[in-house]
């Protein structure tokens, strides 16, 4: 891998639910060279609800800023910056809780943090060298979420739509969309905007000093 810089180059990728955040983050990692990139997903840092009954976990608002363990995420980013690997929690989307397993994230030249609220939380936002917001049409995002949650998370269309109306859309309007003003780069169409992603990658390579 070669010698790591004094501190990694941190990128925050935000946007609404199913806006293409993971697609863009993984594309950046692939094109920059995965050995250069540590990818951190905000979903891994949902607060631990293991002591609550499943019915209560089902009713939890996962789109509110209070749903995330910001101190743990900040501790992990500080450790990566100091050159230490970190045990990233793995989240179980079927049980609505941490699985108990972890994924070891290693220090890298570039650290990409992606999630709905990474530009909303001040303690996290101030760490980023580059802040990206994916501005994807709400209808497109809802369709993507329906397909994903039904296929991958054992949900029904009715429960997905109910959650969208009760928590996802209100949180987007109150927290996520307003955080766009903090972005250095706004990408329309999210992960489908290949030209914008290519330009972003070139800039990341330039700023981070990777080949």
Show the residue positions of the predicted features:
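Post-Walker A helix-loop "phosphate-sensing" segment adjacent to the P-loop in P-loop NTPases
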Residues: 30-38
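Conserved nucleotide-sensing/catalytic segment adjacent to the nucleotide-binding pocket
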Residues: 38, 47, 51-95
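P-loop (Walker A) phosphate-binding loop of NTP-binding proteins
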Residues: 16
């Amino acid at each position: 891998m070669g010698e790591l810089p004094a501190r990694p180059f941190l990128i925050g990728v935000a946007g609404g639910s199913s806006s293409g955040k993971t697609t863009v983050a993984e594309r950046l990692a692939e094109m920059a060279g995965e050995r250069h990139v540590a990818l951190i997903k905000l979903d891994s840092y949902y607060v631990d609800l293991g002591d609550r009954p499943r019915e209560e976990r089902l009713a939890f608002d996962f789109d509110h800023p209070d749903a995330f363990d910001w101190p743990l995420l900040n501790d992990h980013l500080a450790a990566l910056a100091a050159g230490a690997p970190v045990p990233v929690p793995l989240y179980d989307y079927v049980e609505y809780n941490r699985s108990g397993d972890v994924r070891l994230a290693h220090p890298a030249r570039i650290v990409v943090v992606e999630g709905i609220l990474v530009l909303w939380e001040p303690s996290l936002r101030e760490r980023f060298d580059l802040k990206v917001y994916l501005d994807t049409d709400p209808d497109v995002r809802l369709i993507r979420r329906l397909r994903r949650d039904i296929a991958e998370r054992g949900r029904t269309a009715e429960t997905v739509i109910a959650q969208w109306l009760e928590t996802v859309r209100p949180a987007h309007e109150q927290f996520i969309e307003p955080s766009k003003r903090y972005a250095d780069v706004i990408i329309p169409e999210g992960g489908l905007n290949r030209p914008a992603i290519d330009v972003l990658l070139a800039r990341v390579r330039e700023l981070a000093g990777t080949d």
